[in-house]
């Protein structure tokens, strides 16, 4: 016999009845938990519900046209906030400074026929690209956010003195993230990895992958709703580039390398974390192909206008003999981003970013702000319609707004791809190879100091050291075109041999890399340069493409992990295609 209490009375219950009662209680509790998660999984627009009682800290306290100058304080001191309480406070700052629908659109591109067509991206050229409305209100909201965001992060947000990699998962992105992870382990890197899963629904579909597969490789999934907290996840809807900023914010590491899922590293990140380029700067970025197209009006919005009379660089290279622009004609013939106070060229390619949360905590929060409100204003304000609109320049912009330093690699992207030999074909760029940041930094510092000592500007020979085909080894391979999918490749007659059921082209220019190649070449040792050249039959040399397909075979054909995007495919046929491709690539090496 057992007993329970009902209406204050003790009632005897038979064991069988007690078991039934306990089962019912367990079922009810489980359903309540599932219901709570379902609330998070439902798509809810990023607006506040009419019923504000469940999320008092997110209630709409906006004024009609101004923002209160009083500080937006957390419910208790920052160091006493839990991680979820901290993010609720941060998103409350965003909510209070959200743009009313009546103000939109905040920015509108100018018709092509009204834009200036000069080749040089001058101030006037940039200003001709878009009209920005309600600038005083945008400035006021920006100032309010910048003033209220904390300068340092509480320890509940990250674990001090930890290093790791974070990337984005969910369906196809989990597949690419897993390839990235196995490539990392092939290099011998043991850095922990966290994969951001956007929703509870995504997690349900990949629970086995998250809970059983990843832990074998010192990796795990982190869920946006669990990290942000239920109130924030319920009231804000995230998409696209915003997840990268969230991945940075929600990762547990102090020192973070954030990678796009289709990006892989070719040398151990541990060495870069432990190098001067990272220690000196706290944030490391890499270049895109194009010059920056950030609107001059953004500099006014953040309270750091570019006056426009002192040229301090030509592109990404410093000018040691400063050119004072004394006439309107000179100003109109000078690139805006060559002027003192502007962010230097080139634009940023954000497929990889290195970040120290202790030194750049506020930069991280401002990066998040620019991405949360990116679709409404900042993506367009930073790109002005140029290629690559998105999160890429939000990192450098946040650093300037917060007054923090960073280093952007000077070496140009090396584009890898293949030539289409069919009539009308040409070169197909398939991947962006970014260079080792420490060796780039070392060479840049040395070269610039030499020219400073001589009181001269950089000559073309010096600039050529940072060309796409320089000696500095590749650090990451951002394989962003035709993202790897053997089930799709085998049906594409442009790239597959349909008779032999294998690939018919190499995507990555026969790229080979050496393990620990960053130890081989140093710009301080000219005699060592030749050692970084490719040699035949080098046992330490790895065929990048062959290695990539071997990882695909391991995942799909050995481990037999089936991701959602492959659930309707004939995996026997897919695996045969993979094996045939590996055999073909092996003959080519």
From Swiss-Prot:
Please give the residue ranges for the topological domain Cytoplasmic: 1-16
Q: What is its main location?
A: Golgi
EC primary class:
transferase
EC number(s) reported in the record: 2.4.1.-
- Region: Disordered, residue numbers: 50-77
**What PANTHER family does the record point to?**
ALPHA-1,2-MANNOSYLTRANSFERASE MNN2
Q: What is this protein called?
A: Alpha-1,2-mannosyltransferase MNN22
């Amino acid at each position: 016999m057992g007993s329970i209490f009902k209406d204050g009375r003790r009632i005897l219950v038979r064991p069988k009845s007690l078991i039934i009662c306990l089962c019912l209680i367990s079922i009810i509790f489980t359903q309540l938990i599932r219901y709570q998660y379902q609330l998070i999984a439902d798509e809810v627009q990023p607006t506040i519900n009419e019923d504000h009682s469940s999320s008092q800290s997110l209630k709409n306290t906006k004024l009609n046209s101004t923002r209160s100058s009083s500080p937006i304080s957390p419910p208790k001191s920052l160091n006493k906030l839990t991680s979820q309480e901290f993010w609720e406070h941060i998103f409350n700052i965003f909510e209070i400074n959200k743009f009313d629908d009546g103000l939109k659109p905040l920015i509108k591109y100018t018709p092509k026929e009204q834009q200036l067509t000069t080749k040089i991206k001058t101030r006037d050229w940039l200003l001709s690209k878009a009209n920005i409305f309600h600038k005083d209100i945008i400035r006021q909201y920006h100032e309010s956010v910048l003033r209220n965001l904390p300068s340092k992060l509480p320890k509940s947000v990250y674990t001090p003195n930890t290093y790791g990699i974070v990337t984005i998962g969910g369906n196809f992105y989990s597949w690419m993230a897993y390839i990235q992870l196995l490539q990392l382990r092939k290099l011998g890197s043991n850095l922990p990895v966290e994969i951001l899963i956007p929703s509870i629904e995504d997690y349900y579909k990949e629970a086995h992958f998250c809970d059983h597969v990843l832990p074998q490789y010192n990796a795990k999934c982190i869920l946006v709703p669990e990290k942000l907290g239920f109130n924030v996840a319920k009231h804000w809807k995230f998409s696209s580039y915003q997840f990268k900023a969230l991945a940075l914010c929600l990762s547990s590491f102090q020192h973070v390398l954030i990678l796009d899922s289709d990006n892989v590293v070719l040398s151990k990140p541990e060495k870069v974390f432990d190098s001067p380029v990272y220690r000196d700067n706290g944030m490391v970025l890499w270049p895109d192909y194009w010059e920056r197209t950030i609107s001059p009006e953004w500099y006014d919005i953040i309270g750091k206008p570019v006056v426009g009379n002192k040229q301090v660089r030509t592109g990404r290279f410093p000018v040691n003999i400063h050119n004072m622009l004394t006439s309107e004609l000179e100003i109109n013939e000078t690139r805006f981003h060559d002027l003192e106070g502007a962010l230097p060229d080139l634009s940023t390619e954000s497929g990889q970013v290195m970040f120290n949360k202790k030194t750049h905590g506020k930069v991280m929060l401002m990066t998040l702000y620019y991405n949360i409100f990116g679709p409404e204003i900042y993506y367009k304000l930073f790109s002005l319609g140029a290629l690559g609109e998105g999160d890429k320049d939000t990192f450098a912009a946040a650093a300037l707004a917060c007054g923090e330093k960073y280093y952007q690699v000077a070496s140009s992207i090396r584009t890898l791809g293949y030539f289409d030999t069919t009539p009308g074909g040409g070169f197909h760029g398939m991947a962006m190879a970014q260079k080792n940041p420490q060796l780039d930094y070392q060479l840049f510092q040395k070269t610039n100091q030499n020219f400073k000592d001589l009181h001269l500007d950089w000559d073309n020979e010096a600039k050529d050291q940072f060309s796409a085909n320089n000696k500095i080894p590749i650090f990451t391979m951002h394989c962003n075109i035709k993202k790897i999918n053997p089930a799709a490749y085998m049906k594409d007659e442009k790239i597959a041999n349909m008779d032999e059921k294998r690939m018919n082209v190499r995507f990555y220019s026969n790229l080979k890399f050496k393990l620990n190649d960053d130890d081989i070449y140093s710009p301080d040792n000219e005699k060592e340069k030749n050692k970084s050249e490719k040699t035949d039959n080098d046992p330490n040399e790895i065929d990048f493409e062959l290695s990539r397909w071997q990882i695909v075979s391991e995942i799909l054909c050995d481990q037999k992990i089936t991701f959602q995007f492959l659930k309707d495919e004939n995996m026997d046929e897919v695996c045969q295609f993979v094996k045939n491709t590996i055999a073909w690539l092996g003959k080519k090496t």
